[in-house]
Amino acid sequence: MAITQISVRGARQHNLKNIDVEIPRNTLTVITGLSGSGKSSLAFDTIYAEGQRRYVETLSAYARQFLDQMERPDVDSIDGLSPAISIEQKTTSRSPRSTVGTITEIYDYLRLLYSSIGVPHCPNCGKRIARQSAEQIVQRVMSLTPDDRVMIMAPIVRGRKGEFKKEMEKLVQHGFSRARVDGELVNLEDDLALDKRKNHTIEVVVDRLLVKPGIEHRLELSVGLAMKLGGGLVLVAVVNEEETLYSSRLACPDCGISVPQLEPRSFSFNSSYGACPECHGLGSRYDLDPAKVIVDWSKPILDGGLGPGSSSQNLVRSIQLVVQAYGFNLATPFEKFPDKIQNLLLYGEPQRGGKSGFLGILGYLRQNLEASTSDTYREYLLDFMSATECSVCHGKRLRPESLAVRVNGMSIADFTSLPIARALEAARSIQLTGRELTIAGRIVHEITERLEFLHDVGLGYLSLGRSAATLSGGEGQRIRLATQIGSKLRGVLYVLDEPSIGLHHRDNGRLLAALENLRDLGNTVLVVEHDEETIRRADYVIDLGPGAGRHGGELVASGTPAEIMNSPVSLTGAYISGRQHIAMLTERRSPNGKAIAVLGARANNLKNLDVVFPLGVITVVTGVSGSGKSTLVNDILYRALAKQLYRSREEPGTHKAITGAEMIDKVIRIDQSPIGRTPRSNPATYTGIFAAVRDLYAMLPESRERGYKPGRFSFNVSGGRCEACQGEGQRRIEMNFLPDVYVQCEVCGGRRYNHETLSVHYNGYSIADLLEMPVSDVLQILENIPQVKQKLQTLVDVGLGYIHLGQSAVTLPGGEAQRIKLARELGKRQTGKTLYLLDEPTTGLHFDDVRKLLDVLHRLTDLGNTVIIIEHNLDVIRNADWILDLGPEGGEEGGRIVAQGTPEQVARVKKSYTGHALTAYFNGSAKNGSAKNGPAKNGLANGALAPTGTGERA
């Protein structure tokens, strides 16, 4: 009998309360509930962890040491479990060498395609490259300067690992005595020992001769022999001058430029044979930036204008010598110098042997950087450096020879620079002849199919060349989802974490179709999700709760979406059915007459926009993925204001000007990055609560009697902490072929402090007791301490009363980290002139959590502050005072203002996808109780801002 259920019995991981759960196999099942209710504990830390652990245990001990191994979850049993694959939100890769193309493996297929049917062209003149004969190579050599000494060499080994003893012995047997190994001339009869773990290049010297009349016959024989030995390649090296690689296979008839036989590695920017020699395949160089090195262009260079190097007597003396040699006035502000003098000071004299031999300020600093052994000095200079586009490959990462190979008239870099939607069209348009079809038909099919999967999950605006480090968590997750769909596995359990993050409502349907496709292949798809449309389209829903933290971890309801909506105890069901809803403003705020304007925004795909952000209101920036929201708000607005207000060195995206910055005194970006990267960081330390708590304990009579200071109650320094575990509460035991085991410290019992410190109590609680408690409980204990109560209350207000005060920062999801940052800002004194920028703050939030978040944002705004939010959540969009909708599409088809105004005004714009979604909500067709509020009164109707328009400059 076939197993139809995944049965979980007695799940107790984290806050789960010994629950039993049945999950139908081969279904799309959604786990939902409040933040902190135990969703991830059930989906990832219990079900996925056990599935992965069982699979890894089937492998050999040798194989297990290379894999991340999961701890056995706290559960009685799980039956009917399939091999599990987790697709989480974590960023795909931080490596600058990883791109969308490499992580989806589409780039590997492109390398195969271009190496098999690509047409080489001359990188110099653009003509098709043809083969060169031995006679043509002889003519080239004879055209060199008379009496030039040349070596004719044959490449035997090119960039391969090994010792190559047999190859060199064979060369000696054939009468060859010299070769060049890794750039060094060696005698083949010597006992050479090459490191077999490193790449080597071996070129045997076939002949050495002087260019003069009468050597043609000997030269032709030598070239022919070299061709035979080198597989058609001949290297002609003019002693102490340039070297030229000739090929009997591929060479330009006019320029004489030869390229080696095309291989997949010729198109790899991670291989020395394909990578641009200047930037080594990165497409950019991290170098000293003149705009940063000259800290004030309005001042003379030696009087406040120059930053690094200004205190160096050697550099100052060199600059003074340049002044004497070229005759200009050093008292002139740097910006007043003509370009010629600026370039002279920055880059030095254009040729060696100039009047002064000056390297330039940048050259001097580079020289110091290379010679310095001081990490402090290196870190100091990093502040004056920027990533600039490589001047040789212009960001395309590959050698000129590789970039000159074309398929369908496009180079591989041209193809990877296209948005995926257009790359898909280009792949479909490739016409193959009979022979090409045999060679590359399957390759083109794979490329096309994988591009279709990426397009289907809403990533058509990305390019294959997009750096993986710049992808959001949601984009990275959808890329992995597309890769899994492409693998066409069956009988697998897929566990996903909020795949709808970052997706506009327009694209949500395609994502759900992709998940259903994965299910229809014969897989079980388990999704942690809060999105209403996803819950409605699920086959089965598991609702956890009823609260968060210790008040959660119970199975509230399970069944079909209809059964969840009819459940009287399900908070999720109450929101979806309309019994409960998120209230909307009855009247929208009017702007205070002030505004910040971004003029001429042209970064990335923005189309020279003029954008006005009214102050004193909540503005939501909307638009489909890739429409330019993050570029406008994070890359331009935030960086430009941070530069003006805080002298930030981070350069803003391209724009003409920012006006109105004088109307605010602070700009604060509240994102989802971790509040700390070590287990010692926690909400108490981040919000400043811990310092006040330590002061409180230091003031207690027991502490005064013993002479304890606040430092005694820190687990980060010696004195009061447990020295056995260094204040961590646990110790790590290495287990070789098993995962490392963390065991509770046997000295302090996991409490982090020594016995003397723990004996100090406030109202019967030690400081370790408080750190182990939920924030809401600590608030009750410390409610009479004003400076602590206010900060604890803000954590409760943003819906984080369930987290432990001392919970490790590394265990906090992005959504919780963002709300902790929001709570810290709420706890500060408000000036009413602060601009808050938030990027998708509803990530990881249940309907009820969104309600609490909106209450907090309204509080901030009512104090006179301004809030700008990038968001797709319709409840947040409906509660905005002002909407800026970008689009209409993503990538090159985006970057324009589609609509702007109040939600009611945007809802009337027919070409706005956001407007369509708002109209459905206002009309109640979304079947969400929150839509029943209808439109709010237009408090902005009398404002000075136009309701809609493109915002583009003429």
Q: Could you say what each language-model-derived stretch is?
A:
Residues 1-954:
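Conserved phosphate-binding elements of NTP-dependent enzyme cores
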